[in-house]
Design a protein with these regions (language model features):
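Phosphate/diphosphate ligand-binding glycine-rich loop within oxidoreductases
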Residues: 3-120
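Generic structural signal for residues in well-ordered beta-strands
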Residues: 38, 153, 172-173
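Short beta->alpha hinge that forms the Motif I/post-I loop of the SAM-binding pocket
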Residues: 43, 158-159
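Alpha-helical structural signal in soluble globular domains
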Residues: 72, 76-79, 144, 148, ...
């Protein structure tokens, strides 16, 4: 009897030493007897264009993308799903059966789900919502809040220019 194919996955970012993703993913892989491992992939800024195409050659099934690469990674995959395209950022790459790379973004879904888990009757249109930061994850959160009917989203960021750019991108003056 042959064992199931080995699954190699990881998280690309800079830095990634603090990431809890490997501990979480490896726990579930082991708990359910899945043949795989999830590793940290520290990729410095400027090296992303080399790292992402290397996923296929190294036998990865996919990876997650974290700071500071969520926006830049969009240009480095073969296909981007519609949600990630609209959000302007991605956090997941899946190596397809044909070897092509497809990018996704599930940050917004996860954020909305965490709100609903904590407060099942939460509604996006109930009042103003503040978003702290304007990086790749914030883009997904703003998109998801707007999709759920948020009427007023206040962006708070260290630099006003980045907050203004994100607001403008999503249709606010």
């Amino acid at each position: 009897m042959s064992s199931p194919p080995f699954g190699l996955a990881g998280i690309i970012g800079w830095p990634v030493a603090h990431s809890r993703s490997p501990s979480l993913h490896n726990y579930w892989l082991q708990k359910y007897g899945l043949n795989g491992v999830y590793v940290q992939l520290p990729v410095a800024p400027g090296m992303l264009a080399i790292a992402i195409p290397g996923l296929k050659a190294l036998g990865f099934r996919g990876c997650n993308i974290t700071l500071p690469h969520k926006v830049d990674a969009l240009q480095l995959v073969d296909e981007v799903d519609a949600t990630a395209k609209r959000m302007g950022a991605m956090n997941t790459i899946v190596v397809q059966p044909d070897g092509s790379l497809k990018g996704y973004n599930n940050d917004g879904y996860g954020y909305i789900q965490s709100l609903l888990d904590a407060q099942p009757d939460w509604r996006a249109d109930a009042g103003p919502i503040a978003v702290l930061g304007c990086g790749g994850a914030a883009r997904a959160v703003v998109h998801s809040l707007a999709d759920r009917g948020a009427k007023e989203i206040r962006l708070l960021n260290r630099t006003n220019a980045k907050a203004q750019a994100l607001a403008t991108e999503f249709g606010s003056p």
